[in-house]
Amino acid sequence: MRFECSHFPLFLIILTCHISPLKSSQNYQWSYDSDVFGGPHFWGLVEKDWWMCKKGRLQSPIDIQPDRLLFDASVKPVSYAELNFFLIIYLTISLKLMRYIFTCAHLFACNKKLGTWNRIFGANIAKFRAWVVYIIIFHAQVPQLQVVSEFVNTGQMVRVRIGYSSKKPSVNITSGPLYGYRYRVQRIDFHMGRKNENGSEHTINGRRFPMEVQLVAYNTDLYPNFTSASKSPHGIAILSVLVDFGPETNQELIKLTIATASISYKDQRVQLADFEPWRLLPFTRDIITYEGSLTSPGCHETVTWIILNQPIFIKKEHFEEWSHLYLSMEGAEKVPVAPNFRKIQETNNRLVRTNIQHKVWIFLS
């Protein structure tokens, strides 16, 4: 019996022809594009350290189904700690000032001789206090609240890299479903669709949103750096914010939208002088959480996902400006970064928990 194997070298030649142009002309190693070598279907094959992408059973993202969520009273709202010495002093002074103003206002309101003050504050003392809190907490422009950051086009996505120094606050996540550990935000990743497409990674009842903002943090209580934490138990926490279309754009998203013009091509980067990452977060205490994985190679199943149950918004004209981002180098053929999301993974009977007691889903409105 005779076996003909002459087709095998031809297969190698064809495969080589497909791989080489990818690395030379596109100039990237892995991609969210399922139609190319290096796309999600190949993640678990091309690198031995990425085997979890193919065989893992706790993979992300997933579809969030509200009627299957498990209410868990032990899941507390997430706390955001951005405190350093200067910020502690600032907040201490602010609280003392608030107490002083409240006391003075109350005295003015109760003193009948001061009729004008009584008319102003007497019936509206609660509103006055709320107004002062709003001014001090949400409108105070304090340099210490800004972090050192860099906006970069990695070739697979655009990302904000957070830098740290003794004179700037660290951005930390704690409480919630994190078992008391403190996680430091290392970067903020942006997943999106093209002009007329939605590109969030997580979906709600099958609905995909235009964009998803992911604050990626590592456990500083257990691990010395992000790399070791990403491969270790309880190593990573990702705070996910879905972005929907609306009449107004979130203020920090406006800053980033303007900055995208400076990072159109792979490896381009720009410093963000006044970036405040916590302003990307909506005002909500409602969260959804589950144990999953990174959504990029090597898909390590070390992530506690925390999805906020309220979106932030972006105007369509601002969203379209993000479509001028390319995964190719400047001067090469323009290949858009978007869409850059991983497909939905199987839940595999995982518990998806929430602290929401009522059946009001802002995502579904």
Curated annotation (Swiss-Prot):
GO CC terms in record: extracellular region
Stretches assigned to coiled coil: none
Domain Alpha-carbonic anhydrase: 28-356
Keyword Transmembrane: no
SMART domains from the UniProt entry: Carb_anhydrase (SM01057)
Keywords: Secreted, Signal
Main localization, broad class: secreted
Location(s), subcellular: Secreted
Binding, substrate: T295, S296
Active-site residues per Swiss-Prot or TrEMBL entry: Y223
Signal sequence interval, chain numbering: 1-25
SUPFAM superfamilies (UniProt xref): Carbonic anhydrase
GO function terms (MF aspect): carbonate dehydratase activity; hydro-lyase activity; zinc ion binding
Family listed: Belongs to the alpha-carbonic anhydrase family.
Name assigned to this protein: Putative carbonic anhydrase-like protein 1
Native species: Caenorhabditis elegans
Lineage: Eukaryota, Metazoa, Ecdysozoa, Nematoda, Chromadorea
Name of encoding gene: cah-1
